[in-house]
């Protein structure tokens, strides 16, 4: 399960390569993977530039230095039939680099490299200093005091947490030493918030007042570059070029990966949690998870399906169908988590069907209301589960669940196939969505207008998923709850002091499943 094992295996597979393929800027090279399923490209790159790769047909890709030492994972487990990927990243220094690639035998690969002058955005939020500890430091901002401050922070960990009142804490996110900007990805404001520099020091900060039970993942992005000729959306995504785990945070989430760009940092204020990562990832299971490759005639594609079966006998067969299954299972260990909960008697025995979303392009087509997708689930996948796995579950004991677009999809699938899916566990559902030329909150309107169906609901949304006015996922979910209650549906809900992230959804999965199986 640990990613570094994959990295080591990849590196070892290249030890027999005497030479890498040379890659030059602005020139596409292409070829096919042979029986080794791996290859490398070499190039000389300059610092103070950011790189852009366009790749297709490559499943895994790492940036390494000349001797093969890993620097950054750029792609992981991309489907070989997926769309072209565009990747941006900064170069640590002027040097010779390798791109180490992995793919399937016979698959055609394409790769193009471009680099651009690196100019970081000039963005200082200029916000008021409200942290008492930083205010005290600002009164005597000497080099020795700044050095002592960072030494203390390294020992204590970040973010800086200070008292505020009986129900809230003041939390200050910190960064040391950026040139022109630092952004917070996953902020309590639900946006990419810029930090402020403390005078002329190397201290960047941003403070928030948050509830005492706050749970959230975040990254920090120093010196985000200006993207040439970019749209507003493209420039916004530039934060991913440098976004990384907080170097002073002591709690990697879900676990520490092979490089700082590929995991989050955790803020979990004092509050009892069931989803304790990364401990869950190393737990031995009593139950069993089997992996299958499933072809859909309706969707004309293939995907991974994983089925978890508990060790305990299900006197009443129960099933949780979970979208974005690979992420939930591989990165967050939901099968191990539920195995633990079942063993401890906190959940009844329940099977889990993890449905992979293949890639982001197909996810954005399949999960927003799509008639073919609910047909695939009801008429192909559940039939396969019954015929091939011998598991038949009544609709009233079948929960369909997902997060973001997956939350939207769960409510849509149940709306159309209540004969198969009787319960909805929606987390941060994207109920703002509407088909082209339709009003926002389209699915909410469908529930408002249609006859009542035999369904039960559990809706979760984060308090940090709001926007000014009436927008935002939090408000959309509140609107759906109100409509469902007016129509007479059984509805339970949860509003966590959290954002749009998997660590909060891990907790919500337990709470929601417990609520929907507590008959």
Stretch-by-stretch model annotation:
Residues 13-16:
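N-terminal signal peptide c-region/cleavage motif recognized by signal peptidases
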Residues 18-38:
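Non-catalytic extracellular/lumenal accessory regions of secreted precursors
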Residues 33-72, 82, 92-93, 104:
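Acidic, Ser/Thr/Pro-rich low-complexity intrinsically disordered segments
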Residues 41-42, 84-90, 204-209:
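Exposed aromatic-hydrophobic patches
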Residues 48, 94-96, 213-217:
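Extracellular Ig-like/FN3 beta-sandwich strand-entry sites
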Residues 75-82, 194-200:
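Short beta-strand segments within Ig-like beta-sandwich modules, predominantly Fibronectin type-III
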Residues 103-115:
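Edge beta-strands of jelly-roll/beta-sandwich modules across compartments, strongly enriched
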Residues 126-191, 199-210, 214-519:
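Non-catalytic cap/lid and distal C-terminal segments of serine-dependent acyl enzymes
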């Amino acid at each position: 399960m640990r990613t570094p094992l994959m990295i080591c295996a990849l590196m070892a597979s290249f030890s027999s390569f005497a030479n890498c393929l040379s890659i030059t800027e602005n020139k596409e090279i292409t070829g096919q993977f042979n029986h080794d399923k791996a290859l490398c490209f070499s190039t000389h790159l300059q610092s103070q530039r950011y790189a852009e790769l366009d790749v297709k047909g490559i499943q895994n890709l790492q940036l390494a230095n000349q001797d093969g030492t890993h620097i950054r994972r750029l792609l992981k487990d991309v489907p070989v039939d997926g769309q072209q990927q565009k990747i941006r990243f900064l170069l640590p220094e002027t040097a010779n680099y390798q791109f180490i690639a992995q793919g399937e035998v016979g698959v055609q690969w394409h790769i193009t490299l471009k680099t651009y002058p690196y100019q970081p955005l000039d963005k200082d939020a200029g916000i008021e200093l409200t942290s008492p500890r930083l205010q005290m430091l600002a009164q005597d901002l000497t080099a020795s005091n700044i050095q002592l401050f960072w030494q203390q922070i390294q020992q204590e960990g970040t973010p800086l947490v200070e008292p505020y009142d009986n129900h809230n804490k003041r939390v200050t996110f910190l960064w040391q030493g950026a040139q022109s900007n630092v952004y917070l990805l996953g902020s309590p404001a639900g946006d990419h918030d810029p930090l402020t520099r403390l005078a002329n020091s190397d201290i960047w900060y941003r403070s928030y007042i948050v509830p005492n039970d706050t749970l959230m993942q975040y990254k920090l992005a120093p010196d985000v570059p200006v993207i040439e000729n970019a749209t507003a959306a493209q420039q916004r995504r530039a934060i991913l070029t440098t976004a990384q785990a907080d170097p002073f945070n002591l709690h990697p989430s879900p676990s520490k990966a092979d490089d700082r760009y590929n995991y989050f940092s955790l803020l979990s204020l004092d509050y009892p949690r069931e989803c304790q990562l990364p401990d869950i990832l190393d737990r031995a299971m009593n139950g069993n998870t089997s992996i299958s490759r499933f072809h859909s005639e309706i969707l004309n594609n293939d995907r991974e399906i994983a089925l978890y079966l508990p060790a305990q006998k299900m006197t009443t067969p129960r099933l949780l169908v979970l979208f974005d299954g690979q992420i939930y299972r591989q990165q967050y260990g939901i099968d191990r988590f539920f195995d633990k909960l079942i063993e401890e008697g906190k959940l009844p025995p329940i099977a889990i069907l993890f449905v992979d979303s293949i890639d982001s392009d197909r996810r954005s087509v399949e999960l927003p209301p799509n008639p073919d997708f609910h047909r695939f689930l009801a008429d192909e996948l559940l039939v396969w589960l019954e015929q091939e796995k011998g598991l038949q579950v009544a609709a009233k004991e079948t929960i369909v669940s997902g997060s973001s677009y997956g939350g939207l999809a769960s409510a849509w699938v149940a709306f159309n196939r209540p004969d198969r899916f009787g319960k909805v566990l929606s987390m941060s559902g994207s109920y703002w969505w509407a088909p082209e030329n339709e009003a926002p909150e389209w699915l909410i309107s469908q529930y408002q207008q249609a006859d009542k169906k035999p369904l039960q609901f559990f809706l979760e949304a984060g308090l940090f998923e709001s926007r000014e006015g009436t927008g935002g996922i939090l408000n959309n979910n509140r609107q759906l709850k109100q409509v469902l209650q007016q129509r007479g549906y059984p509805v339970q809900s949860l509003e966590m002091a959290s954002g749009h992230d998997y660590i909060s959804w891990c907790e919500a999965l337990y709470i929601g499943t417990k609520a929907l199986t507590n008959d």
